[in-house]
Every structure is written in structure tokens, then in C-alpha cells.
């Protein structure tokens, strides 16, 4: 194996500790070509699709990418913002918020972000942080619940990059924070703030709150992945914080891909059933997504909304994700600070000298 050439740090004396927020990724543009490139990288990850690689690549290249690239590009175009992809825009705002919060608390740390798929990639950002003087890096996945297909593959990518480095930085990882009190409090604050602005559902009249988490194949649960358990844990704690019962609040799973069985109940059929059963208002919140993206804005806010209304529902509300809300930035800062303990994150005072 050939190791990377080590270049001198550009700022070795200023910042020795870095925090790297990691999210899933996004295409660079809402075009079929860009989306196909992104999906090819995403769906080629063996932690995402666990079937024999050769067989899967034939299916992916011949049957999925040519058609799904066009269809997905249309969906991305429907949610694309003037500044770019919603996930990228929201993640950049989270970086800015966390950086500002840590600076207010006298932390002299670098804060940036990387995407597991697409740009900026994890290896490139690790190298960039090293050039900026980082000798210690905290990897902070923006996935509150651990899963092999999200958290683990992000760490895989980071560790693969380390294997090529001659001079490796010290690494810490945040595995999960599904039950962290600050995270749960931020979720509850987000829901309460939305209800304060748009009105609270009439739960006594049968209105519902649905907590929709990203789905994964059920097979991963059977193989020992803790994701389902942690989603249930987050949901239960959030219900408790909101003082809701399991009759008033449901936990579901969205974004099913392919024909295999995924974690259930599925979000879209659940909303369709609620509408058909006479539920007037349904609010949907996605606690596992820390930033709004295609799956929350388009899938929930458009597709699932239409399913509910066409089935007979009257009032649909998509509660925005945590994004860069004040409560979430404060919670993120608390989680990060706890995981930075023992590292030199604050500037040392310059000793005063006196003349003889």
C-alpha cells in the first residue's frame, strides 16, 4: 500500500482539535446525471445493500440507475433551494451554529462537515482538517440512532482514509445519542414550537402525531442491528416529553426501497389508513432526520400528505426537522462537548513575563 504524502499543516499552532459533522449525502445538482452518480455511489455500498456485489451491480447498472436517476432528479428539482440541496444548506447552517456556540464558550476547535456519499467526502475533509492543524478529530454522525447502513459505513469511510495516512490524527467517534436528554428535549421543543405557531392537534377528537423514522430492511434487525430498538426508544422518550399516549402518537418507518420486507409499520400506508378511518388531522415529525432533506420535504410533505388527504383526511402538517433550531444547536453543542472531554479544546492563557 502506498501512503499519502504528508504536507505541512497550514495552521499548526492555532487549532489542534476538530469536530466533523457527518451526514448521508446529496447530489450536486437536481439533474439525472448528477443523481445517477450519487445513487451509484450510495447503492454500491455493501453496508446499504447486502447482496452479492456482482449480481447487484448488474441489477443496479442495467435496471435501476437508468430509470431511477430520472425519476429521482424530478423529485430533487421539486425541493431544490436557491442555495442548493436542502440537506447541504441545512447542514451548513448547523455547522455555523455549532461553530458560533463553541466559540462563545471559548472553544478553539475547528468545525466542519462531510457527506458519506457525494461531496464534500469524508476522506477529503479529514485531509483538509489535518492541513488546518487538526491532530484530534471527533466524528459526529448526524444520525441519532445507530445503524450499520448509516453510522457504521461513515466510520468505515473515515477509517479507510486513515489507512492511507502516514501521519494519522487521533480519532473519537459518537456512536449514537438516541436517548440523550438534550436531543429528546430539542425534539420536544421543535414540536411544541410548531404547535405554538400552527395550533395543537385535537387529540381528544382523534387527531394523531406520527413519528416517522427512516426504514431499513427487517433482515438487519434479525441480524442484530440495534437501529429498530433505538428508534423505539427515541419515540417513547419523545412521547413522554410531549405527554402523549401510544393511541395519540404512532411510530412508523418510511423510504422503503425494493420488494423485501422492511421495518414496519410503513409510514405511507399508516397515513392512508388514518385518513380512511376518519382521522381529521395528522401531524408527521421525523425525529431520526436532524436536517430536512428529500425524504422529509418531498416524501413526507408531498407524497405522504397526498395519500392522507386522498384517503379522507382533512388537515396534514409536516413538522420541520431540527435543522439549525436554537434548541438543537444547544443540544448538539452539549453532546459534542461531552465527547471532547480531555482534549485541549480551549486556548491556554499566555503566561505573563516580568522584567528582572
Curated annotation (Swiss-Prot):
Q: Which HAMAP family match?
A: Ferrochelatase
Keyword list, A-Z: Cytoplasm, Heme biosynthesis, Iron, Lyase, Metal-binding, Porphyrin biosynthesis
> Which family does the record claim for this protein?
Belongs to the ferrochelatase family.
Q: What is this protein called?
A: Ferrochelatase
Q: Which organism is it from?
A: Paraburkholderia phytofirmans (strain DSM 17436 / LMG 22146 / PsJN) (Burkholderia phytofirmans)
The reaction(s) annotated as catalysed by this protein in its Swiss-Prot or TrEMBL entry are:
heme b + 2 H(+) = protoporphyrin IX + Fe(2+)
Catalytic class of the enzyme: lyase
InterPro entries, per this entry? Ferrochelatase (IPR001015), Ferrochelatase_AS (IPR019772), Ferrochelatase_C (IPR033644), Ferrochelatase_N (IPR033659)
Q: Tell me, what is an example of a GO biological process annotation in this record?
A: heme biosynthetic process
Q: Where does the record place it? A: Cytoplasm
According to its UniProt entry, the function of this protein is described as: Catalyzes the ferrous insertion into protoporphyrin IX.
Which Pfam family, an example, fits this chain?
Answer: Ferrochelatase
Q: Which pathway does UniProt place it in?
A: Porphyrin-containing compound metabolism; protoheme biosynthesis; protoheme from protoporphyrin-IX: step 1/1
Give a GO cellular-component term.
Answer: cytoplasm
Q: What does the record give as EC number? A: 4.98.1.1
Q: Where is the organism placed in the taxonomic lineage, from the top?
A: Bacteria, Pseudomonadati, Pseudomonadota, Betaproteobacteria, Burkholderiales
Q: Which parts of the chain span the membrane according to its record?
A: none
Q: Name one GO molecular function term.
A: metal ion binding
Binding-site residues, Fe cation = 214, 295
Entry-linked PANTHER family: FERROCHELATASE (PTHR11108), FERROCHELATASE, MITOCHONDRIAL (PTHR11108:SF1)
Amino acid at each position: 500500500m502506498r501512503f499519502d504524502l504528508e504536507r505541512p499543516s497550514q495552521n499548526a499552532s492555532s487549532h489542534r482539535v476538530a469536530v466533523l459533522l457527518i451526514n448521508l449525502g446529496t447530489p450536486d445538482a437536481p439533474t439525472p446525471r448528477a443523481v445517477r452518480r450519487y445513487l451509484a455511489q450510495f447503492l454500491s455500498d455493501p453496508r446499504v445493500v447486502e447482496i452479492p456485489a456482482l449480481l447487484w451491480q448488474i441489477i443496479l447498472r442495467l435496471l435501476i440507475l437508468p430509470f431511477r436517476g430520472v425519476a429521482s432528479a424530478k423529485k430533487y428539482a421539486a425541493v431544490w433551494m436557491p442555495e442548493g440541496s436542502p440537506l447541504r444548506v441545512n447542514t451548513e447552517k448547523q455547522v455555523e451554529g455549532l461553530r458560533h456556540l463553541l466559540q462563545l464558550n471559548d472553544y478553539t476547535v475547528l468545525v466542519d462537515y462531510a457527506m458519506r456519499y457525494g461531496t464534500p467526502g469524508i476522506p477529503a475533509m479529514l485531509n483538509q482538517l489535518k492541513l488546518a492543524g487538526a491532530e484530534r478529530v471527533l466524528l459526529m454522525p448526524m444520525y441519532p440512532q445507530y445503524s450499520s447502513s448509516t453510522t457504521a459505513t461513515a466510520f468505515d469511510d473515515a477509517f479507510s482514509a486513515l489507512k492511507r495516512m502516514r501521519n494519522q490524527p487521533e480519532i473519537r467517534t459518537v456512536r449514537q445519542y438516541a436517548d440523550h436528554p438534550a436531543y429528546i428535549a430539542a425534539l420536544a421543543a421543535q414540536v411544541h414550537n410548531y404547535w405554538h405557531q400552527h395550533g395543537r392537534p385535537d387529540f381528544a377528537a382523534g387527531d394523531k402525531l406520527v413519528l416517522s423514522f427512516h426504514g431499513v430492511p427487517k433482515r438487519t434487525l434479525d441480524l442484530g442491528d440495534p437501529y429498530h430498538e433505538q428508534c423505539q426508544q427515541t419515540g417513547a422518550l419523545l412521547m413522554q416529553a410531549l405527554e402523549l399516549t401510544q393511541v395519540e402518537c404512532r411510530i412508523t418507518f418510511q423510504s422503503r426501497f425494493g420488494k423485501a420486507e422492511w421495518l414496519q409499520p410503513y409510514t405511507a400506508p399508516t397515513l392512508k389508513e388514518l385518513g380512511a378511518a376518519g382521522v381529521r388531522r395528522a401531524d408527521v415529525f421525523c425525529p431520526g432526520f436532524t436536517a430536512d432533506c428529500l425524504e422529509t420535504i418531498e416524501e413526507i410533505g408531498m407524497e405522504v400528505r397526498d395519500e392522507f388527504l386522498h384517503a379522507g383526511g382533512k388537515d396534514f402538517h409536516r413538522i420541520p426537522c431540527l435543522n439549525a433550531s436554537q434548541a438543537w444547536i444547544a443540544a448538539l453543542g452539549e453532546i459534542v462537548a461531552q465527547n471532547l472531554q480531555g482534549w485541549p479544546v480551549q486556548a491556554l492563557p499566555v503566561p505573563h513575563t516580568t522584567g528582572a
